């Protein structure tokens, strides 16, 4: 339930697609805080695939977490797929990432880290483009001494490294 709350706080919609009996799936959905209308039981692999494709057709990006043999096709179809550590080899092979253990509580942290990483990479690229677009032409036109442009490039690289070190810090609420 805590993982579902945290994922919702990150702006994600949660769906349960399971091959288990519908009654059991609905009970688990209510227990963890997923609406019964977003919990589907007795799904075949094709049912899961159809539901994911329907969400994608609505413009949604799908992150799928699975562990079973029947999850292979839907894991391959999702934009991002995660197999739990104890997943069958087929599910692990079709996944982008294998999460060690079966702790879904690590999923919100994983998503926060991925978002932060994308943001930092984007900022680093923007900085590099800015620096190169401004200072390389100045050096080529000899309006900036080559040694100063070289020093600036070294400082720029150092800035990118230091800026990227933010990724090593624990996130808010995460233990070090």
What are these regions (language model features)?
Residues 1-123:
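Conserved ATP-binding TGD loop and adjacent catalytic N/P-domain core of P-type ATPases
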Residues 12, 95-176:
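Membrane-embedded transport module
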